[in-house]
């Protein structure tokens, strides 16, 4: 039987050791816990891999940080994990970090690095009324990269962008067991809700937002389609893993790294266990 053990920098399960098979290690990284939505999609497709989830609760949220800070921070965190584990592949499960740091990561490391981008292309194909909503952080909405996606894949659609950092906070709160205020969601989405022809397809352009899918469907008009990048990222990851030439293997258990252990992080431990993780540790930088 497993029992919980908590130290200054570690929360873990103490259990009778089991012989785990050797398998490739995937690091999934986000500034917060929103990347768990992407991790969950990947794990459903590839359940037998070794997973590390890392989140930067010390610098969260990234939306208000400078580009240089984000690049240096993400490279530093991935480097710190790589020093402790032989990584086969890294997924940057954060839209803000992906649009900024991928070139630097791919230049620094030899393993594949997968990023997430708003699912504008599939949404443009799915819309029936030609009105697509892009729900993301303010930073993602304003990025030139996002505008390029719209220009490339959605010129035939009306794109209504809505930037909200409040939704990120609500998603984090929900994962920690807090009730979500429907009236607060209605207030955030009011620019769309008061339109005579609101979006019939909404791009969830932040990895936190799939965690709020149930509540968003309650507020948005009936039949509104929600589109995110999770499934596409999982398929891309599966293809890359299948085509790696002699990737490094691990027999370790799944674990989570944060940048500081706080009471708030400790409350996440039961949720992280349900996601299949065996320990939560502070990552020294």
Swiss-Prot record:
Pathway: Cell wall biogenesis; peptidoglycan biosynthesis. It holds the Pfam family Asp_Glu_race. Keywords: Cell shape, Cell wall biogenesis/degradation, Isomerase, Peptidoglycan synthesis. One of its GO terms (biological process) is cell wall organization. HAMAP family: Glu_racemase. Belongs to the aspartate/glutamate racemases family. Provides the (R)-glutamate required for cell wall biosynthesis. This is Glutamate racemase. The gene is murI.
